[in-house]
């Protein structure tokens, strides 16, 4: 059953963010489709600093745009979690120079701005 707030929401934002923000790789489907090897894809972890990740600025922008909710990928098909997970060591917290829980920062900033928070967590995991 759809919640009333969602039915009435006019604008929502969906953020695909991950280690593929480093280079010229278009999201995690690149290695699945054979455009890049899994090993080369995962090398992006070495350069993932999240230095331009600013959840508060995003929240301000989304609020100004009139968004009522925001959904972010917490873990996409590549298996790289954007949060500190006890399930695997494959996270931006443990495997990248960023060493930050981006989901925690995102969630806090969106809620502080009065935006509803959603998370996309892929059950598909090509890292297994």
Where is each model-derived feature located?
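Mature catalytic domains of secreted/periplasmic carbohydrate-active enzymes
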Residues: 1-128
């Amino acid at each position: 059953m759809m919640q009333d707030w969602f039915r009435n929401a006019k604008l929502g934002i969906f953020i695909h963010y991950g280690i593929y923000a480093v280079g010229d790789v278009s999201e995690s489907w690149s290695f699945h489709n054979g455009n890049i090897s899994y090993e080369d894809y995962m090398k992006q972890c070495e350069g993932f600093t999240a230095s331009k990740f600013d959840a508060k600025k995003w929240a301000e922008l989304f609020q100004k745009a009139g968004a009522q909710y925001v959904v972010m990928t917490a873990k996409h098909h590549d298996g790289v979690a954007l949060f500190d997970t006890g399930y695997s060591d494959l996270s931006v917290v443990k495997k990248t120079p960023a060493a930050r829980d981006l989901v925690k920062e995102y969630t806090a900033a969106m809620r502080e701005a009065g935006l509803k928070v959603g998370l996309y967590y892929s059950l598909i995991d090509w890292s297994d």
